[in-house]
């Protein structure tokens, strides 16, 4: 079987091994990619995972407290401890924590949202559109647009970044990955607000945080 340059490139991206080692492994494996990975690992020439598939198990846990009324804990992972100590990475994690305090997302990404919740929201939005007298043939498209808006309201990576609303938190994350040169992942977060779930006088603490961020 002919070993193409694209096959060698793919194996190199998966394993981090040298080009010639990748070509030899593919030749030995008769073009079977999985077997070629095994060959390289047997020879100690392959990392377990690379690039976006690389394991990001280092990183930081950042906390932010706003006036004793809003508290956030967020975990952001990097591949190496070296990057976790990098000031740009630290600043990014801090900005993410402040953004969560200000924008109150419920999930990191849309894949984390319970499908049952999405279906329920679609059902409600469909009924709303029909009650508004919209033709059935355009209701589906309208609901799709409103579901996208729904995701942008509750998913961290899709929210406009508080310090620069022209970019999303996801855009900012992609920019940092490119600049730092390592896979970075916002893994999880928790946000607390005083009196959450208790009926009380309306106070917009999140707006206060957003104003504070804009001043920094």
Curated annotation (Swiss-Prot):
Sequence segments annotated as region (Involved in Mg(2+) ion dislocation from EF-Tu): 80-83
GO molecular function terms listed in the Swiss-Prot or TrEMBL record: translation elongation factor activity
Signal peptide (UniProt feature, chain positions): none
Listed Pfam families: EF_TS
Disulfide-linked positions: none
The organism of origin for this protein: Alkaliphilus oremlandii (strain OhILAs)
Protein name, per record: Elongation factor Ts
Key words of the record: Cytoplasm, Elongation factor, Protein biosynthesis
Taxonomic superkingdom: Bacteria
GO CC annotations, alphabetized: cytoplasm
PANTHER family linked: ELONGATION FACTOR TS, ELONGATION FACTOR TS, MITOCHONDRIAL
Family from the record: Belongs to the EF-Ts family.
């Amino acid at each position: 079987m002919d070993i193409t340059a694209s096959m060698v490139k793919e194996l190199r991206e998966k394993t981090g091994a040298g080009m010639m080692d990748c070509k030899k492994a593919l030749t030995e494996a008769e073009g079977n990619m999985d077997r070629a990975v095994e060959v390289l690992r047997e020879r100690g020439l392959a990392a377990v995972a690379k690039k976006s598939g690389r394991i990001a198990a280092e990183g930081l846990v950042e906390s932010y407290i706003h006036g004793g009324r809003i508290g956030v804990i967020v975990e952001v992972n990097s591949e190496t401890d070296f990057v976790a100590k990098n000031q740009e990475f630290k600043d990014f994690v801090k900005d993410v924590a402040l953004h969560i305090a200000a924008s109150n997302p419920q999930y990191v990404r849309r894949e984390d949202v319970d499908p049952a919740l999405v279906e329920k929201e679609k059902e409600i939005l469909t009924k709303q559109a029909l009650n508004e007298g919209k033709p059935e043939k355009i209701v589906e498209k309208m609901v799709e647009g409103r579901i996208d808006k729904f995701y942008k309201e509750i998913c961290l990576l899709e929210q406009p970044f508080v310090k620069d609303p022209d970019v999303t938190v996801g855009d900012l994350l992609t920019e940092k990955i490119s600049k730092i040169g390592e896979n970075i992942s916002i893994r999880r977060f928790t946000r607390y607000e005083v009196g959450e779930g208790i009926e009380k006088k309306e106070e917009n603490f999140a707006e206060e945080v957003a104003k504070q961020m804009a001043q920094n």
